[in-house]
Design a protein with these regions (language model features):
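Hydrophobic alpha-helical segments
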Residues: 1-207
Length: 207
């Protein structure tokens, strides 16, 4: 249930014009998401940190990667739900749709273990993502061996890269109560609310 929390962000997003040296990164994010995320607009107070995150994000989402870019967003979504980050759940849901995941597959993500829309390789990967995103980490040798049955070592590096990126982003956005953008809230309310998602503290600056 959406409790309409309207707490103030702990740090306010700054206008994108604040950091001219980051404009190329901002435009790349706008192309991928349809908007510039408030997380990076907060982070630009330290441009080197914002630039490093932008470069890491670009590498994780590399269009020349060997793991489907839409499915990578699903991995990030499952990892973010495991961590409890409503902000990143909305962003990854929108990203999944933007990069080719069908509505019905996104809607079935929390029944992935039984849904015919998810392959054995995808189910194994999402089990792994939950274990890797848990605190403490619960990945086992057997789990990793199962992952190896479906992916090359290069692909496994990409998968762990996604989970690790969201380990950072989940903590960043939950700690700073980053306000969700209108576009992300709309995605969350359409596709995630029926599974218990709410903007919660990330609704700040919207209501």
């Amino acid at each position: 249930m959406d409790q309409r929390t309207t707490s103030s962000p702990r740090l306010m997003p700054l206008p994108s014009e604040h950091s001219p040296e980051l404009q190329d990164h901002f435009e790349a994010m706008r192309k991928n998401l349809g908007f510039i995320p408030n997380s990076i607009l907060i982070m630009q107070r330290r441009p080197k940190l914002a630039r490093a995150l932008a470069q890491m994000t670009a590498a994780v989402w590399d269009p020349e990667g060997k793991v489907d870019r839409g499915f990578k967003r699903i991995i990030g979504h499952v990892a973010s739900r495991t961590a409890g980050c409503q902000y990143c759940m909305a962003h990854t849901a929108g990203g999944a749709l933007r990069f080719g995941i069908e509505d019905k597959k996104l809607a079935a993500v929390w029944e992935y273990q039984t849904s015919p829309l998810y392959s054995t390789a995808e189910r194994t990967t999402l089990d792994f993502a939950i274990a890797a995103a848990s605190v403490p980490n619960t990945v086992t040798d057997d789990m990793f061996a199962e992952l190896r049955k479906h992916w090359t070592e290069e692909q496994i590096v990409e998968i762990v890269g996604v989970i690790s990126l969201f380990g950072f982003l989940n903590r960043w956005n939950d700690t700073l109560t980053t306000p969700l953008e209108d576009e992300a809230i709309a995605i969350g309310e359409q596709f995630l609310a029926s599974h218990g998602w709410s903007p919660g503290k990330h609704r700040a600056l919207v209501d």
